[in-house]
Amino acid sequence: GIPIILFSGPRIEIKPYIKFSGIFKILKSIYNVFKNKKAMPYIIGYGGHTYELFGYRSWTFACVVFLSSTYNVYLSNIFIANFLAIIGLTGIFSSIIGAQYCIGKNRPLIISYMGLICFFGSIITAFSFWINLYLALLFIFIYNILIIMDSGSLTTGTVLNGSSQDRGSRLALHSIIGFLGGALGGPIVCLLYTSPSPRDP
């Protein structure tokens, strides 16, 4: 809230006070969002996006430690912490650049291309683990950029596809489904890590 107060200018959007009209009207508004065939693909896509992102974030630290042990190369805690911090920082710029690139273009097509590139990026990243530690770290970094590139574009697509009257409901559903995907991503990756291998006795 503090950045909004500091940087939004002297006047924030002012709307007339509307009396609370009951939970059923809110549910109806959310139901109407489900029927919005233009906005829902972006909302569902955001759920898939956060599923992949939070799954990625949950295994990155353990993955770097594992790679360090596998290649018998010592990586200090400070190096790993700074590496992860840089990953998080560059993700912000990746999302902004991706959103800016979609302006005035065929947004669904571009987001589809972004997802396809990210898919191939994940495969290349996995193969890099067998080649070299530092090459693997490089592709982990690149893969992060590819994951987050469509984040702002998906949110913008949700905002643009609908009327101003139900914008709040669209964004609420966007966040709920998005973070539901994020809540599932980490535990599922953890389950895959801890599940017994076929080679285990």
Which positions does each model-derived feature cover?
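A late C-terminal transmembrane helix in Major Facilitator Superfamily
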Residues: 166-191
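C-terminal transmembrane helical hairpin of 12-TM major facilitator-type secondary transporters
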Residues: 109-153
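Paired intracellular helix-loop junctions of major facilitator superfamily
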Residues: 158-167
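Helix-to-loop junctions at the C-terminal end of transmembrane segments
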Residues: 95-106
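Juxtamembrane intracellular "pre-TM" segments in multi-pass secondary transporters
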Residues: 13-43
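Extracytoplasmic gate region of multi-pass secondary transporters
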Residues: 41-84
